């Protein structure tokens, strides 16, 4: 999924028409970068489950046309809700709360638990 596709899905959740979404588009790339940063733990949990090496920093899209470099299913299921929430956080608190809750719930259901060793202290 590209950043633009995610943005259009977020606009659909907000009930915005593409031509009326120009205002939000100015903030979309920064918000997507923030989502990638916020989801690094989940990105790494999915990478670990696939046998891939963990990332130290989240991948950052350079433009909205770039593909979002994370698990495709997670991005498609979760990111439109998170992006929509970030885009309306200052203007519609009710939508922000619903979208943020939906984003968090979908992320929790989608991502595996991170596995790690427990250090014996005694």
PLM region spans:
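Conserved short "hinge" loops at termini or chain/domain junctions
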Residues: 1-64, 98, 106-122
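Residues in soluble alpha-helical coiled-coils and helical-bundle/repeat scaffolds
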Residues: 19, 90-91
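Active-site-adjacent structural patch at catalytic or cofactor/ligand-binding sites
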Residues: 62-66, 81-82
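Short, hydrophobic/amphipathic alpha-helical patches that form generic packing surfaces
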Residues: 77-90
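Small-residue hotspots
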Residues: 85, 100-103
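Short conserved catalytic/interaction loops centered on acidic-Pro-aromatic/His motifs
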Residues: 92-100
């Amino acid at each position: 999924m590209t950043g633009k596709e995610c943005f259009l899905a977020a606009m659909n959740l907000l009930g915005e028409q593409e031509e009326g979404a120009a205002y939000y588009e100015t903030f979309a790339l920064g918000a997507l970068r923030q989502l990638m940063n916020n989801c690094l733990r989940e990105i790494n949990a999915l990478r670990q489950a696939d046998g891939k090496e963990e990332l130290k920093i989240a991948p950052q899209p350079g433009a909205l046309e770039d593909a979002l470099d994370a698990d495709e299913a997670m991005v498609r299921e979760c990111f439109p809700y998170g992006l929509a929430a970030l885009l309306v956080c200052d203007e519609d608190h009710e939508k922000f709360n619903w979208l943020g809750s939906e984003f968090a719930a979908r992320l929790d259901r989608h991502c595996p638990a991170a596995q790690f060793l427990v250090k014996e202290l005694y």
